[in-house]
Protein backbone atom coordinates (compact mmCIF):
# COMPACT_ATOMS: atom_id res chain seq x y z
CA UNK A 1 0.00 0.00 0.00
CA UNK A 2 1.63 3.30 -1.04
CA UNK A 3 1.81 6.29 1.26
CA UNK A 4 0.05 9.57 0.46
CA UNK A 5 3.41 11.12 -0.40
CA UNK A 6 4.22 8.34 -2.87
CA UNK A 7 0.82 8.79 -4.54
CA UNK A 8 1.40 12.54 -4.86
CA UNK A 9 4.79 11.95 -6.46
CA UNK A 10 3.88 9.07 -8.77
CA UNK A 11 0.10 8.67 -8.97
CA UNK A 12 -1.91 5.66 -10.05
CA UNK A 13 -1.51 4.31 -13.56
CA UNK A 14 -4.85 3.58 -15.23
CA UNK A 15 -5.40 0.24 -16.97
CA UNK A 16 -5.13 0.23 -20.75
CA UNK A 17 -8.31 -0.89 -22.48
CA UNK A 18 -7.76 -3.03 -25.57
CA UNK A 19 -9.67 -2.04 -28.69
CA UNK A 20 -12.21 -4.57 -29.97
CA UNK A 21 -11.50 -3.86 -33.65
CA UNK A 22 -7.73 -3.49 -33.70
CA UNK A 23 -7.30 -4.75 -37.27
CA UNK A 24 -9.29 -1.82 -38.71
CA UNK A 25 -6.68 0.73 -37.50
CA UNK A 26 -9.32 3.16 -36.12
CA UNK A 27 -11.17 3.20 -39.47
CA UNK A 28 -14.95 2.64 -39.65
CA UNK A 29 -14.55 0.14 -42.51
CA UNK A 30 -11.71 -1.55 -44.37
CA UNK A 31 -11.50 -3.31 -47.72
CA UNK A 32 -10.10 -6.80 -48.06
CA UNK A 33 -9.79 -9.91 -50.23
CA UNK A 34 -11.36 -13.25 -49.27
CA UNK A 35 -8.81 -15.99 -48.71
CA UNK A 36 -11.27 -18.71 -47.70
CA UNK A 37 -15.06 -18.95 -47.38
CA UNK A 38 -16.41 -21.61 -45.01
CA UNK A 39 -18.93 -22.41 -42.29
CA UNK A 40 -18.57 -22.74 -38.54
CA UNK A 41 -20.87 -24.07 -35.82
CA UNK A 42 -21.84 -21.73 -32.94
CA UNK A 43 -21.37 -22.04 -29.18
CA UNK A 44 -23.33 -24.36 -26.90
CA UNK A 45 -27.06 -23.60 -26.76
CA UNK A 46 -27.28 -22.66 -30.46
CA UNK A 47 -27.03 -24.89 -33.52
CA UNK A 48 -26.41 -23.77 -37.11
CA UNK A 49 -23.78 -23.47 -39.82
CA UNK A 50 -22.71 -19.82 -39.75
CA UNK A 51 -21.05 -18.53 -42.92
CA UNK A 52 -17.63 -16.93 -42.38
CA UNK A 53 -14.81 -15.64 -44.57
CA UNK A 54 -11.12 -15.30 -43.86
CA UNK A 55 -10.16 -11.87 -45.21
CA UNK A 56 -6.81 -10.18 -45.81
CA UNK A 57 -7.31 -6.45 -45.31
CA UNK A 58 -5.50 -3.69 -47.18
CA UNK A 59 -3.25 -3.20 -44.14
CA UNK A 60 -2.18 -6.88 -44.51
CA UNK A 61 -4.03 -8.05 -41.38
CA UNK A 62 -5.87 -11.36 -41.69
CA UNK A 63 -9.22 -11.54 -39.92
CA UNK A 64 -12.30 -13.76 -39.79
CA UNK A 65 -15.49 -11.93 -40.81
CA UNK A 66 -19.12 -13.04 -40.61
CA UNK A 67 -21.32 -13.01 -43.73
CA UNK A 68 -24.81 -11.91 -42.60
CA UNK A 69 -28.14 -12.86 -44.18
CA UNK A 70 -29.45 -15.85 -46.10
CA UNK A 71 -27.23 -16.96 -49.01
CA UNK A 72 -24.22 -15.17 -50.46
CA UNK A 73 -22.10 -15.05 -53.61
CA UNK A 74 -18.65 -14.83 -52.01
CA UNK A 75 -15.78 -17.04 -53.10
CA UNK A 76 -12.00 -16.93 -52.95
CA UNK A 77 -10.47 -13.66 -54.26
CA UNK A 78 -13.76 -11.74 -53.83
CA UNK A 79 -13.28 -8.14 -52.65
CA UNK A 80 -15.35 -7.22 -49.58
CA UNK A 81 -15.82 -4.28 -47.23
CA UNK A 82 -15.53 -5.15 -43.54
CA UNK A 83 -16.92 -3.33 -40.48
CA UNK A 84 -16.54 -4.01 -36.78
CA UNK A 85 -19.09 -5.93 -34.75
CA UNK A 86 -18.72 -9.33 -33.17
CA UNK A 87 -20.93 -12.38 -33.57
CA UNK A 88 -22.09 -13.40 -30.10
CA UNK A 89 -22.07 -17.17 -30.61
CA UNK A 90 -18.92 -17.47 -32.75
CA UNK A 91 -15.71 -17.08 -30.70
CA UNK A 92 -12.99 -15.10 -32.47
CA UNK A 93 -15.29 -13.56 -35.11
CA UNK A 94 -15.15 -9.82 -34.42
CA UNK A 95 -16.00 -8.37 -37.83
CA UNK A 96 -18.92 -8.31 -40.29
CA UNK A 97 -18.86 -8.19 -44.09
CA UNK A 98 -21.04 -5.37 -45.48
CA UNK A 99 -23.74 -6.55 -47.90
CA UNK A 100 -24.33 -4.67 -51.15
CA UNK A 101 -20.78 -3.25 -51.33
CA UNK A 102 -17.95 -4.43 -53.63
CA UNK A 103 -18.34 -8.11 -54.67
CA UNK A 104 -20.79 -9.12 -51.91
CA UNK A 105 -24.30 -8.65 -53.30
CA UNK A 106 -27.31 -7.58 -51.27
CA UNK A 107 -30.14 -10.00 -50.55
CA UNK A 108 -32.69 -9.94 -53.40
CA UNK A 109 -36.38 -9.69 -52.50
CA UNK A 110 -35.81 -8.54 -48.94
CA UNK A 111 -38.44 -6.07 -47.70
CA UNK A 112 -37.64 -5.46 -44.04
CA UNK A 113 -34.30 -4.35 -42.61
CA UNK A 114 -33.09 -3.69 -46.16
CA UNK A 115 -30.37 -1.24 -45.17
CA UNK A 116 -28.55 -3.92 -43.17
CA UNK A 117 -28.53 -6.31 -46.12
CA UNK A 118 -27.80 -3.98 -49.06
CA UNK A 119 -31.18 -4.30 -50.78
CA UNK A 120 -32.61 -1.53 -52.97
CA UNK A 121 -36.19 -0.33 -52.43
CA UNK A 122 -38.63 -2.38 -54.56
CA UNK A 123 -40.79 -0.52 -57.10
CA UNK A 124 -44.12 -1.82 -55.77
CA UNK A 125 -43.27 -0.95 -52.15
CA UNK A 126 -45.89 1.28 -50.45
UniProtKB/Swiss-Prot annotation:
<dbReference type="GO" id="GO:0015935">
    <property type="term" value="C:small ribosomal subunit"/>
</dbReference>
<feature type="compositionally biased region" description="Basic residues">
    <location>
        <begin position="109"/>
        <end position="120"/>
    </location>
</feature>
<comment type="function">
    <text>Protein S12 is involved in the translation initiation step.</text>
</comment>
<keyword id="KW-0689">Ribosomal protein</keyword>
<feature type="region of interest" description="Disordered">
    <location>
        <begin position="106"/>
        <end position="126"/>
    </location>
</feature>
<feature type="region of interest" description="Disordered">
    <location>
        <begin position="1"/>
        <end position="27"/>
    </location>
</feature>
<keyword id="KW-0687">Ribonucleoprotein</keyword>
<protein>
    <recommendedName>
        <fullName>Small ribosomal subunit protein uS12m</fullName>
    </recommendedName>
</protein>
<dbReference type="InterPro" id="IPR012340">
    <property type="entry name" value="NA-bd_OB-fold"/>
</dbReference>
<dbReference type="GO" id="GO:0003735">
    <property type="term" value="F:structural constituent of ribosome"/>
</dbReference>
<comment type="similarity">
    <text>Belongs to the universal ribosomal protein uS12 family.</text>
</comment>
<dbReference type="InterPro" id="IPR005679">
    <property type="entry name" value="Ribosomal_uS12_bac"/>
</dbReference>
<dbReference type="GO" id="GO:0006412">
    <property type="term" value="P:translation"/>
</dbReference>
<dbReference type="InterPro" id="IPR006032">
    <property type="entry name" value="Ribosomal_uS12"/>
</dbReference>
<dbReference type="Pfam" id="PF00164">
    <property type="entry name" value="Ribosom_S12_S23"/>
</dbReference>
<keyword id="KW-0496">Mitochondrion</keyword>
<dbReference type="GO" id="GO:0005739">
    <property type="term" value="C:mitochondrion"/>
</dbReference>
<feature type="compositionally biased region" description="Basic residues">
    <location>
        <begin position="12"/>
        <end position="23"/>
    </location>
</feature>
Amino acid sequence: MPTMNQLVRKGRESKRRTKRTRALNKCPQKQGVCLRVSTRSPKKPNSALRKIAKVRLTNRNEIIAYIPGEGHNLQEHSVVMVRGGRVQDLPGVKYHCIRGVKDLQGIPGRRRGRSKYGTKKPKDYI
